Every structure is written in structure tokens, then in C-alpha cells.
Amino acid sequence: MKHSVSFTYGQHQVTLETGEIARQADGAVIVNMDDTIVLVTVVANKTVAEGQDFFPLTVDYQEKNYAAGKIPGGFFKREGRPSEEETLISRLIDRPIRPLFADGFLNEVQIIATVLSYNPEVSPDIPSIIGASAALKLSGLPFNGPIAAARVGYVNDAYVLNPSPKALKNSRLDLVVAGTESAVLMVESEADQLSEAVMLEAVMFGHRQQQVVIKSINELAAQAAKPAWAWQSPARDEQLDTEVKNHFEERLVAAYQIAHKQTRQETVAQIHADAVALLGIQNNAHGWEETLVNEYVHHLAYRIVRDRILKKQPRIDGRDTKTVRPITIHTSVLPRAHGSALFTRGETQALVVATLGTGRDAQLLDTLDGEVRDNFMLHYNFLPFSVGEIGRIGSPKRREIGHGRLARRGLSAVLPLEEDFPYTIRVVSEITESNGSSSMASVCGSSLALMDAGVPVQTPVAGIAMGLIKEGDEFAILTDILGDEDHLGDMDFKVAGSATGVTALQMDIKINGITEEIMRQALSQAHEGRLHILEVMNQAIAAPRAELSDYAPRFSSMRIDTEKIKDVIGKGGATIRSITEQTGTTIEIEDDGSVKIAATDKAAAANARRLIEEIVAEPEIGRIYDAKVTKITDFGAFLQFLPGKEGLVHISQIADYRVNDVRDELTEGQEVKVKLLEIDRQGRVRLSIKEAK
């Protein structure tokens, strides 16, 4: 039976519908937001896989080309592997939903969001999050939702709910916030150096506006929700709890005071092994399963680390809650790279490299909106040796794509306009050591590498990751968190920005949301940490270098008559290809006649410019040209004096004396100077060799 609810959300009309499509899924909802239509389905396994010790949730977001009336390109003419944007939206759906599943629920769950219809004025990400929340609410799974999501813009000092992609171009903010009725769970944003106060109010504005969504999902659930699963959270085994505490608490307390990450991990791993040996069923008829023993040891470590912090005792590495780890910076570390920096903060290290290219190096993206050209790329690579592990090297994983996009958001606001700096920019962050906050190390390293490359950024940018430990009303905000503090804490709160304001904010909560006061304190503490990091960065390099690297391309610009573009390009691109091969340059010609010549050698650029000028030059009567003999006849010779332009030197114009045979004076391929005498009405050109002497 079909059920639906409708509501107004900002400027959009939204309908949630279920009961007609995908009826064999545990939950299925079609979200229609002004003709952007997304089908979201939820399916869960009824049993837990043997030995399962984590929650296997998978979210797949996919855009169908037919949604925008397009046929896919390529040989196969069908959708292939997920694009970067699809991967990012998959993560955006996953992040606010994951923490709301009941503790101990380990059944595999798959959420699929499929874009069926696309209105360019409505981005599919917000409908997808809403649809996932609604489908979960209908499924009967142990999910503590619903949640809602909203996009917030900031135009003319006013907040805008769910602005269109076109409106976002005039907005100083692009923020997505998701949360439950009472608390915020997730924030993803890019901003134009806005204050912490403006950012916080944007989050709260979005949270207030999304209440209508939560109300509507609850209305739909009242009509069509399936019965709740007969599932109960596993009861705590008090005996195992006691055994683990009695035998291993003292060792765990000592282990989590070891500052060196690898030594600490090895010590904790040994404690786990000893616990399994002592309490596991393999060696003890009255023992417990290995996964259960490890779970209880981990839970004890969780309690130890959190309790120490809430009691205001030193953190794992001995710091207080507001101290940033020691920072070291080196720039120009790679002699042939256009710009490079090695940024190390504690045991987290990023080697970041900036490369400058031409417009031809820009990335072309095939999206539902058509082909999009992107002249700024930031790629994040998490190498397995950075955490002392062996791993596969291949295409980037979801996490790497997400971290790269976050770092890019942090830098976009301070990049120069393309008309002021006509380069394609690629930044690559290689994580060579990792112990928390590697994405924010990438922001810092990228800012340094860009300045080292001579990119005229408006101002330096730094990033910092904040953490949270919360028990009841008691909480502690942690500055510059370690990997273990991220793992054992309740929040990952990343802030990037300049000394002026915030450029990117990302927040993920592992508990059932946080309050405005916690966010305010986290932003304030992050501001202090960011200014400290910027101060250290400025000691290494305070402004972009005045000169580009000797190995970076230089641009020379000129303009030609649009009627001459075809002459410069030549048949099938032969002419321009010949110039680039001859000079070793890269040449771009726009439809308006603007020409950009890129070369690492000034002489090569000048040579390419001269060749183009010769092609587009208009012949001038009385001017002397360097010419080449192309054909000899009985009455004279034809010579090319400009690319694509020939003229005749009559036998009488070859020399001051009488010439009986042209071949006695000239040969094909010979180069001589000629003077242009006349261009007749038919465009025929008369040249003279003797007048040029």
C-alpha cells in the first residue's frame, strides 16, 4: 500500500513516498524535492556473521545518467565505478547515520541511494540523507533516528536554507548539517574566512530548520513502519568484566601513559594476547570467546583513557587539553618540484607537493550537469608505512577521497582567481607518518607548498582536529587529538582557516549528538590552536615566493584576430602541433582570440610567439621578409615569406643584372630576403630580391 507525506522545506516542496517501489527491501523511500528524485533502500541481514566484531554498514550513492536525460560516454555506454562526487555523498549519508545504530548491533546493513531524476536547481545529497533516515525509520532496525539534513548558505549577511547550486556561487558559505530532533550529529562545510560565531549560528540555523523533516518522517513511520526487530543488546558479562579489570587494569593504565605510539600499540597488543591466553575458551574450559575477551579489554582501555582526561590528568602523550604537539617545518624539500613542504606535528607527518600546469592539465569531470572543468586538485594519499603496516597500493579509498576533499575545502577560499593566476594547480599530500589529524596536517602542508611554489594565495591556512570526551553533563575538549584519542573519544571536529576566519569545518559525532555550548567551546579552542600553528608556519614561510620555480611553466599571453584562429590551428591541428613540437611549448587558444603560451624557457616562448605572429601577420608593402624558395619557373620563382603566404619574384626582380635562367640564381629551399612590392586586387603578391639588398 502506498503512503506519502509532503512538506515545504525552504523554497522546495518535498514528498516522501513508500509502498510502491522496492517493496522487498526492509525499508524503501522515494524522496522528491522539486523534481530531484532519489530512491533510498535499506536491507539488513537477519543474522550476524560468525566472528563479526564490528558494525558492517555500507552506503552506496549512485547517479544515473538518465536522471539528467543523458547517455553515458565511453565504449560501454553505461555507468561505471563511482565518481569522486558519488563517493563523497556516500560518506555524507553514512556519517550521521552510523552512530545512531544500537551498540552491539553487528548485522550487515546496506543502504543504496539512487538518483532517478535530477533538477539542476536541487542537489541530490540532502534528499539522499533524508531518504536514508526515512528508510531506516520504516525498516524496524534498531536505529535511534530519525535524522534530517539541511544545506545552509550565507548571502548578504543572511542565512539561506537549501540554496540552489547557482545561488551558492554568491554565498560565502556552503554548509551541510545533519542531526536528530535534539542534537547535531554531523557538519560538512566550506567557507570564505567566516568567524566562528557565524559558523556556529549557521549550524544552529540549519538544525532548527530541519525539524520539519523529522516531524514528516515520524508521520510517515506512523503510517507505514514495519514492526521493530526482535533484537536486544547483548547483556554485559559481569564476571568477564571483573576478570579483565582484576588482571589487566594496572597494565592498561601504564600502557596508556606511553607517549610513543608504536611502543604503546605493541604493549596494548600484548595485553590483549595475554588476556585471550588467560581468559579465552581455547585454554580455559570455562573461558570466553576471543572476540568477547578483546572487546572487554578494549572497553576497559576506553574507560581508563576517558576517566583520566575527565579528571584533568595528563593525556596519553603527557599534554594538557589545550596544547598542540611540537611542530617542525621544512620547505623546498624536493629540488625539481614546483613547490614542496614537509610538515610534522608530533607523530603525524605530511610531505606535500604543489605542481603548476596549463589549462590543458585541468581535470574534466562528466557530471549530471554536463562537463565541468576543475583547475585545482588536491589529492591525499595514506601510505601503509605511515602507521608501520603492510598494505596494498592502488586506487584511492573512500577515506582518502574524503580527506583530500576536506583539505581542498580548507584552501579554496584563499586561492587566486584564474584570471589573475592562469595555472592549473595540483597538490598532493603524501602521509608519511600518522598518529591523528593527518587531513589537517595536509591543510597546513598544502598551504606551505603553495606558497613555496609562488602561488599568490591570499593568506596562509592551517588546520587542527579537536576531540571530545563526554560523560553525562561532564565533558572535556581536546586540542590536536592523537589517533587513540580519536578512536576512544566521542567527536572528531576539524577546523581549517586563516588568522581571519574559518575556511572549512567538519564534525562527526559518535554519540547521540552534542550541544551548542560544546560546539562553541570547541570552536574557541580550535581558534587558539590554529593561531598557534599559523605562527609556527609563518616562521618557515610567511608569504608566497616572489618567483616561480625554474621548472614551472611561464605564461606569455597575446591576442589574435578571431578570423585567424583557424590559420594558427591549421588543418587537423597540424600548424599548432608543429609549433609546439618545434618550440617545446604548450599553446592554448580561446574562442575570443586570446592565446596563452606556456614554457619553462623564455626563449622557447618567444620563438612560439614569433611563429604565431608570423602566421597572423598581414603582409605590408615595402617591408622586407625572410623568405624561402618553394617553386622555380621559367619566368621567376615563388617564395613563402610568411607562414601560408607566397609571392612571386619575377625574373627581372632577382638581380641588378640580366638573369637568363632563374635556376642559375635560385634553388628550391634556398632562403633569401625579399621586399614586398605589391598586392593586386586578386591578392597576388609581387616580391623583389634585388630591392631587398
From Swiss-Prot:
Please give the function described in this protein's UniProt entry: Involved in mRNA degradation. Catalyzes the phosphorolysis of single-stranded polyribonucleotides processively in the 3'- to 5'-direction.
What are the KH domain coordinates in residue numbering? 553-612
Q: Which coarse location class describes where this protein primarily resides? A: cytoplasm
Transmembrane ranges, per UniProt, are none
SUPFAM superfamilies the UniProt entry points to: Eukaryotic type KH-domain (KH-domain type I) (SSF54791), Nucleic acid-binding proteins (SSF50249), Ribonuclease PH domain 2-like (SSF55666), Ribosomal protein S5 domain 2-like (SSF54211)
Query: Whose protein is this, by species?
Result: Dichelobacter nodosus (strain VCS1703A)
| Name by which UniProt lists this protein | Polyribonucleotide nucleotidyltransferase
What reaction does this enzyme carry out catalytically? Answer: RNA(n+1) + phosphate = RNA(n) + a ribonucleoside 5'-diphosphate
Q: Which residues form the S1 motif domain?
A: 622-690
Q: Where does Mg(2+) bind?
A: 486, 492
Biological process (GO) annotations held by this record are: mRNA catabolic process; RNA processing
E.C. number: 2.7.7.8
Q: Which GO terms describe its cellular component?
A: cytosol
Q: Which family does it belong to?
A: Belongs to the polyribonucleotide nucleotidyltransferase family.
What is the gene called? pnp
